[in-house]
């Protein structure tokens, strides 16, 4: 099946939030299932120095009264084919923000739609967040292209209808209130990035005033949990670490902790309880909770805290003041550094995610992968990925609290600090987290099923010989006929012509004429 991703980010070249990780890591897992997956994204100015891009475009087009060019290149690590929409409006170094943000991404969405119609026509056009929200509206006219829309963060909803009226030809009744609403209405399939978040956004508390619409489309809404690239994030082979380690041998973490303390200007103490946080510094991430409890926690325990990230100026100022009150015990780096983030995951004892809401979260998965025990709030994808630690049952991978409240958060931190005093059980807790399977292979199977549903394709079944053998009782499981597990076969690629003529076609005339074109 031909699948075209349309997104504003792709890790590692352009990454602001979790969407970049998804767009950069999911396509290889889908390719392993037999899909031909490609990506179209804005041609930001910074990409020309980070990728090998030919001087000549593969296609020139026009939309919204403006000409653009499309350049073809490859992902630097996984070889994914990437199409870049080239136009001077994407030249600045910034990704988001600016007075022209709404126009820029509406223009990109329109260019992506034109490319899909005229150059590389996919069976499924997979759109990510509000930047591509108008694509399902335009593609609704084309019965040969199905659309899937992924909600990465419902809080960011795109330009409102009065702006869209001036930028697109779509009448007002096709747009909803904003691009997010338009995508939810017209996409053939919609998914959130975790099962719990897909349920939460149908309630008034987390819906950002879209609960009515989300309940209306609940029949096509599902939650598919994000994953991580286990090869790119592997503590046993990570070259950014001073010492590698694995679940079977955790000795290297002590060296990483020492280097982290030295680099961040903390007292070098192997017995100190070191808390790490790598995050955008915004209200969503619960940084204000940390500011409320940090002084008391530092007064009564031997805790150290390291924070890496950028964001809201008020929160940055609060963190700086906290660091100045506790020299040698609190360190704050207001930047983003990939190597330093890996060192924080590999050297910290616990990882903080006290989020107000969390669609899925990638950081807690990376933390567990590197043996860093997460302390999280029970919300969104954190519920699906961090089962609470139960010392009596020797189960769970982290510490959880319910209410977005400093008392609850402080209690969870004290519980984790007390557990850290018992090193034998703490190491078992670390190992359980490191052995969790949050690879993209599991998520890719669910996306594959979703693609088949929106295209009207049936699930692949066993061949006739296997069914006959099973019916005669020769083997209890046809896949074990030779005494071995048969490797799953990838689905055959379906052309657009096959889709229009197949029994599951979205074209109602196919049933009337028996799949024959008249």
From Swiss-Prot:
InterPro entries: Glyco_trans_1, GS/SS, Starch_synth_cat_dom. One of its GO terms (molecular function) is alpha-1,4-glucan glucosyltransferase (ADP-glucose donor) activity. It catalyses: [(1->4)-alpha-D-glucosyl](n) + ADP-alpha-D-glucose = [(1->4)-alpha-D-glucosyl](n+1) + ADP + H(+). Keywords: Glycogen biosynthesis, Glycosyltransferase, Transferase. Gene3D superfamilies: Glycogen Phosphorylase B. ADP-alpha-D-glucose binds at residue 15. The keyword Coiled coil does not apply. Pathway: Glycan biosynthesis; glycogen biosynthesis. Its EC number is 2.4.1.21. It comes from the Bacteria. One of its GO terms (biological process) is glycogen biosynthetic process. Synthesizes alpha-1,4-glucan chains using ADP-glucose. This is Glycogen synthase. It comes from Synechococcus sp. (strain CC9311).
